[in-house]
Curated annotation (Swiss-Prot):
InterPro entries, per the entry: Ig-like_CS_Receptor, Ig-like_dom, Ig-like_dom_sf, Ig-like_fold, Ig_C1-set, Ig_sub, Ig_V-set
Lineage: Eukaryota, Metazoa, Chordata, Craniata, Vertebrata
Gene Ontology CC: one annotated term: membrane
Location of the Ig-like V-type domain: 31-136
Glycosylation sites: 244, 291, 318
PROSITE patterns in UniProt: IG_LIKE
Protein name, UniProt field: Signal-regulatory protein beta-1 isoform 3
Keywords associated with the record: Disulfide bond, Glycoprotein, Immunoglobulin domain, Membrane, Repeat, Signal, Transmembrane, Transmembrane helix
Disulfide bond annotation, renumbered to this chain: 54-120, 169-227, 272-330
Length: 398
């Protein structure tokens, strides 16, 4: 029986089978697609490039791949296969190649701020917006960053020997968090210090702050305090920061006042020796009985081996100008500190008066007068007595 021309043409069994298999294949492709991120975590040094691997097992459903840092509504778009400008991101494979399933990316010039978990996400093509289809498990990127050079700071004001002063050491921007810090004075490790690493929790980078206590001695002008930082990112020696104790210490002077004889009559040379002081800034004032005689600023200093200085000032005193004893004072102002002083008592002796014509003879001269008279008049007396005796003799004989 012939088939009427008005009946619809029924699909052949082959066509039905083809359509059915195509539909089943598409559904199976969607169900079987997997987004594979083989690296659970990677670590990259700051300044280098990081490669984030991602492959898919199917090209179905049709739609782009996008990369994000973080998950949830606040995640950050790192790369979009179809649109956008991402100057630091390049693809590892040729995405224009047919049947490409490798969507790995490379991020250049990594900084600590790039640390985080990166997700490779497959989208299904939609209109007007694409719909997220499946995400990879994520790859955690950690950044190894070197610590900055340690900066050591001392106290704001100078301190004298036997006092305890504090020094601080800071270093920033390193990752991971583990770090070692040590203090040294002249090569000897210090133990009295406290160290903190911030923040306490997870962070893209960290900072370290340490405070050490140092007891000053008179020999510390040439001493150094060193802060040493060791970190996994440092290939060679640890980083070091240094502070010179010459910028911290003040060594007060010791004074000695002495009297030196001079050849000139009625003059005495008094010297003031200022010893073992640091820093150099010093002013000296001479006082006679409390009155200022002379003020001078230290110059032409003598440096000692320990870094301290010596200086000597002298004062020439005219003794004849004084009727009474003189108190000489050497007063020193060092580095803006209250003055210190040392005194010396200068004895003024009574001077003998010149003898005049009316000056009474002393006891010694009075006792010697009779002897002197006898010595001068003795021969004359004997002569007179002799002449008298001869005259009497001739008178009687006649």
């Amino acid at each position: 029986m012939p088939v009427p021309a008005s009946w619809p043409h029924l699909p052949s069994p082959f066509l039905l089978m083809t359509l059915l298999l195509g539909r089943l294949t598409g559904v199976a492709g969607e169900e079987e697609l997997q987004v594979i991120q083989p690296d659970k975590s990677i670590s990259v040094a700051a300044g280098e490039s990081a490669t984030l691997h991602c492959t898919v097992t199917s090209l179905i459903p049709v739609g782009p791949i996008q990369w994000f840092r973080g998950a949830g509504p606040g995640r950050e778009l790192i790369y979009n296969q179809k649109e956008g400008h991402f100057p630091r991101v390049t693809t590892v494979s040729d995405l224009t190649k047919r049947n490409n399933m490798d969507f790995s990316i490379r991020i250049s010039n990594i900084t600590p701020a790039d640390a985080g978990t990166y997700y490779c996400v497959k989208f299904r093509k939609g209109s007007p917006d694409h719909v997220e289809f499946k995400s990879g498990a994520g790859t955690e990127l950690s950044v190894r960053a070197k610590p900055s050079a340690p900066v050591v700071s001392g106290p704001a004001a100078r301190a004298t020997p036997q006092h305890t002063v504090s020094f601080t050491c800071e270093s920033h921007g390193f990752s991971p968090r583990d770090i070692t810090l040590k203090w040294f004075k002249n090569g000897n490790e210090l133990s009295d210090f406290q160290t903190n690493v911030d923040p306490a929790g997870d962070s893209v980078s960290y900072s370290i702050h340490s405070t050490a206590k140092v007891v000053l001695t008179r020999e510390d002008v040439h001493s150094q305090v060193i802060c040493e930082v060791a970190h996994v990112t440092l290939q060679g020696d640890p980083l070091r920061g240094t502070a010179n104790l010459s910028e911290t210490i003040r060594v007060p002077p010791t004074l000695e006042v002495t009297q030196q004889p001079v050849r000139a009559e009625n003059q005495v040379n008094v010297t003031c020796q200022v010893r073992k002081f640091y820093p150099q800034r010093l002013q000296l004032t001479w006082l006679e009985n409390g009155n200022v005689s002379r003020t001078e600023t230290a110059s032409t200093l003598t440096e000692n081996k320990d870094g301290t200085y010596n200086w000597m000032s002298w004062l020439l005193v005219n003794v004849s100008a004084h009727r009474d004893d003189v108190k000489l004072t050497c007063q020193v102002e060092h580095d803006g500190q209250p003055a210190v002083s040392k005194s010396h008592d200068l004895k003024v002796s009574a001077h003998p008066k010149e003898q005049g014509s009316n000056t009474a003879p002393g006891p010694a001269l009075a006792s010697a007068a009779p002897l002197l008279i006898a010595f001068l008049l003795g021969p004359k007396v004997l002569l007179v007595v002799g002449v008298s005796v001869i005259y009497v003799y001739w008178k009687q004989k006649a």
